[in-house]
Amino acid sequence: MAEKGLSKKTYWIYGIGVSYFILDQIYNQWLSYYYLPPANEQTLKPLLTPTLLILAFIFGRIIDAVTDPLVGYLSDNSKSKYGRRSFFMLLGGLPLALTMILFFFPLRSSIMATFLWVALINGLFFTAYTLVGGPYNALIPDLAKTKEDRLNLSTVQSVFRLIFTAVAMILPGYFIARIGNGNTEKGIRATVVIFTILGVLGVYLCAFMLNEKELTKNREEHKHIKFKDSVKHIFEKEIVIYFIAFFLFFSGFNILRGIVNYYVVSIMELSVKSNTTISALLFGAAALAFPFTNKLAKKYTYKKVLIGDIILLIIGTVGLLFVTKENRILAYPLFILCGLGLSGSAFIFPLTIISDLAVSLGERKNISVEGIMFGIQGMFLKLAFLTQQIVQTTLLVRGSKTLGNGFKQATKMGVYSTLIAAIVLFSLSLVFYSMKKEEK
């Protein structure tokens, strides 16, 4: 897929850098499960009430709120000898790994101690996540000079991102069962350590081996502007519409992938390790659709293909509402359908659209805003995480009996309710994506 100007080696090294998405998936899939397990999980007990868990997530986001655009702005103006993006990846990798592991070793001296632990670690985790993810994604418009190049590099990143996400969705269930040997907490802790090391290793390989400084030496120099002036440029109509659509979509997507464990255990009534099969179908279908999505985007437009993807995703998610233990075989083709819809909507197009917007704005204003654009997108992605956590934590316990100390557990009614919320968010994102004009 490499085009003139970028070698195959560069594509490979850049793709490896998205390994931090292993941690993203662990966070999304296992954190709520660890602190708020389903009723039929025998070896895990709730560590926080739903309300306290939500407050911990919100508190962490407040700490993190300013870092996304700030890191983006700093990387746009960095003069580091390691490259203006790679420097921040090197800076954030180790803190990202450490905070991920600490999530699963909370203080338990009291409920308040656990709450403060989760809130603090959450803020530190996403600050480190910003240092890695924002500058990494901003490399796309730095390295790729044309719209087609950006589509290709985004597709390569999406392939690797899907591989790493799938690894983190498919394998942990097996590792947890095998290592834990009946003790889910032991299995989760060991599995998190293993996969966290793998995820951060790719970040450092990319930062050290990409040779960003050499690859971007001919990049056009733009005038330096103040942080507040950079932010002002982001409020163009088309950019605002895109960010709203992006936020709504990823709120729904995070909910969908975040309840896979609950769906498998509570609705399909299978063991937690069975999420391996479901996850493989979901992300395998997306992977198979990548080359077709790339070709369709070149033949038609990003917008048309993206809208088609979201419609497929809505149909598949609606179908999941009608699955029960008795007809659970229907869940398999429905997750495949969802996976086909995720190919462009969750993986390829968010990267290409924001890259094109950043390049277009930069050329019109003679400014460098790639980093801050991806930083603000990262901020909306984290707001989507927060929305997912609030919606999921609130709805999953619908119909649950209150246990001691106000604890509740996830229920079937809660899983179905959470899916409905995802469908609503997907539908709203479809409306806003339909409003956005196509970049030339």
Regions found by a protein language model. Give the residues of each.
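Membrane-embedded alpha-helical bundles of multi-pass transporters/translocases
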Residues: A2-K440
